[in-house]
Structure formats: C-alpha cells, structure tokens
Amino acid sequence: MPERSQRVVLVRHTLDPEALTALGARLCYAGGDVDRLLKTIEEKDQRAFVERVMAMGHESVLEHASFTFLVEGVSRVLLAQLTRHRIASFSVQSQRYVSYAGGFGYIVPPAIRALGSDAEAEYHAQMAQMQAWYEGWQKRLGDAGEKSNEDARFVLPGACETRVLLTMNARELRHFFSLRM
C-alpha cells in the first residue's frame, strides 16, 4: 500500500473560545451576577484580559474551550506519544476491526529517506515482508476476521499508519504544543 501524507483537520471547536475563557476568568475575579459578566464580555475584546490572566499563571480557565482534530497518516509510534496527553479524548482506528490484508499504509521516517534510494528501497522491502507475515498469520489463525486480526496485528510495525480523532481543551493543547512542536 502506498505511503500516505499526514493530514490534520480541525473538525469541531468551542464557538468563541476566547469569550468563554474570559467568562471563566472574570467569574473568578469579579463579583456580581452572570448577566453583568456576560454583558462585559460582549461589549469589548477580551484578548488583553485573557493574556493578563494567563501571564498570572491562571491557565485552568483555558479548559472550558475544546478543539477536536482528525489526524491521518501518522504512525502507531506517534500515536503512543500523542496519547500520553491524558487530558484529551482519543478514538483510534482499530487494528482488530480493520483488516490490513492487501496492504497497510506506513510512515517512512525522514532519517531513513535521507539515507538515499537504496536505504528507502530496503525499508519498503521490509514493510512488504511484514505485510506477508501479517497475511500469513491471518491464514494460520483461520481467516476469522476480527479474531485473527487481533493476533496477526502483533507483527505489524510501529510505522503502520493509523487515524485518530482527538479532542483537547485549550490548556492541554497549549501544553501539547509546548512539548511537541
């Protein structure tokens, strides 16, 4: 199966996350009723206020805004790093319910690609060998669909391409970017 390109799509997000964040912050620091707080937020841009609150280290207000992304063309290895961010929700393409008979997508690391065409050809040949092993195990396990996929998948490499739908609140997204970007 050919290599796929990476793709990240923002599929949903909190409407007006800045205003929602500002509401959370103003609720912490202001007296009065909710109607007055909402009116304050509607009347002026909240960016400077949110930045000031963030500079004070009050980041919990970011947790009210969330963002959901669909990520394709990434390796299972990347997935292992991504899911270390536990203040997030993940739905991952299953290697049990999705059969890779006929070919699995995989990621070629840039360092291997940089070694030149011979190294890259060797890598592709190794992926083809793993595909053959996978299909061989499926057959030995009785081509029983999900049941044989479940055990055959253990020979698939960390480079195996996957998809993930993930949702993070703004605070965790900011933390994620500080570590991973």
Q: Which residue ranges define each predicted feature?
A:
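Family-specific signature for flavin-dependent thymidylate synthase
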Residues: M1-M181
